[in-house]
Regions:
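N-terminal Sec-pathway targeting helices
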Residues: 1-11
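Bacterial N-terminal signal peptides
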Residues: 11-19
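Bacterial Sec-dependent signal peptides at the C-terminal "C-region" and cleavage site
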Residues: 19-29
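Alpha/beta-hydrolase superfamily serine-hydrolase fold, recognizing
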Residues: 30-51, 55, 62-330
């Protein structure tokens, strides 16, 4: 089953429902609760740019405090099979779900507080018993398949500890989304049990930069990856993690491989995401898999991670929750 969706912005949804009573549909329809900041058009893009500028170049007096786990939560830095991981667990979990978080960063950076904070939200939305953030090896020191080896080690380590694969959710954003798909493919090819679900946020599905796609069409629109960001000068460079592999090698670019036999997957991206085209292609490639693909109009790369206060980000997290509840009944 392949489900393609387009998120309706909160402002448009409220406006549409507000006129329903006047359109002959009978009973008045209640306007749904909207959570988060609702912005549209130029105001939204100006807000996003301001927030991204502050994230990339924070003033000395406004640098965020170091991550602290919420009161009552367990938080530990440990390792599984010599791979560094960080474990977070809420005080009173009501389900057995375990999230394996594979962070983004172009395979060039390690785990950061941005992901630790996001992990807390992920655990809450997915009703997870615990979440493991994997600090996998990355370029420039390490090349393919170092990150895949580390992700596999942690996954198998969880199974060895007694975690059922049917209780595991693998989440990955950007490069982490690439790694999540690569891990699922590796498990399939080795005959190992699959997790219950994959959640992919703006996955990096193609290592090759291609003109005439969202890589160029959204260059001026994506305030997270595009023009004016620290990533912009490197977008046409050969990713160091690729090593000696050609960029269209299926081991690097999952959009070029067979995705049959993978678990249900949710792919979320933004209408202004630099990686929109390859995410569309990834979803199309997975048409023999139970995949839900949702585009959030006018939103940039990994928006729920970097803009958690916006209504679209909250809606995306709620979609993750509903997706997990559908495929992993409590």
């Amino acid at each position: 089953m392949n489900t393609w969706k387009r998120y309706i912005g909160a402002a448009a949804l409220i406006l549409g429902l507000a006129v329903l009573p006047h359109c002959g549909f009978g009973e008045t329809t209640a306007v749904p609760e909207v959570r988060g900041i609702v912005l549209t058009g130029e105001a939204k893009q100006a807000y996003i740019k301001t927030q991204m500028d502050a994230l990339y170049c924070p003033p000395e007096d406004k640098k965020p405090a170091s991550f602290t786990a919420p009161e009552g939560w367990a938080y530990e830095k440990t390792s599984i099979g010599n791979v560094p991981v960080e474990r977070l667990a809420p005080p009173k979990p009501t389900a057995k779900r375990v999230v394996l978080q594979l962070h983004g960063g172009a395979y060039m950076s390690g785990l950061t507080d941005l992901y630790r904070t996001f992990a807390v939200r992920q655990a809450a939305y997915t009703n997870a018993r615990e979440i493991y953030c994997v600090d996998y090896r990355h370029a420039p020191v390490y090349r393919y398949p170092a990150a895949l080896e580390d992700a596999t080690t942690v996954y198998q380590g969880l199974l060895a500890r007694g975690t059922r694969p049917s209780d595991i959710i693998i989440f990955g954003d950007s490069a982490g989304g690439n790694l999540a798909v690569a891990l699922a493919i590796h498990l399939r090819d080795k005959g190992l049990p699959q997790p219950a679900a994959l959640i992919l946020l703006s996955p990096w599905a193609d290592f090759e930069h291609k003109d005439g796609t969202s890589r160029t069409e959204n260059f001026a629109k994506d305030k997270v990856l595009g023009e004016g960001t620290p990533f912009a000068p490197h977008l046409r460079s050969t990713p160091l993690y690729a090593g000696d592999l050609p960029l269209d090698d299926p081991r690097l670019s999952p959009g070029h491989t067979d995705l049959r036999g993978l678990p249900p997957m949710l792919i979320q991206t933004g209408g202004y995401d630099l990686l929109l085209t390859e995410d569309e292609q990834l979803a199309a490639k997975a048409d023999d898999t139970d995949v839900t693909f949702t585009v959030y109009p006018e939103m940039p790369h990994v928006f729920p991670l970097v803009l958690p206060e916006l209504a679209e980000s909250i809606a995306a997290c709620e979609e993750m929750r509903d997706f997990v509840d559908h495929h992993m009944p409590r």
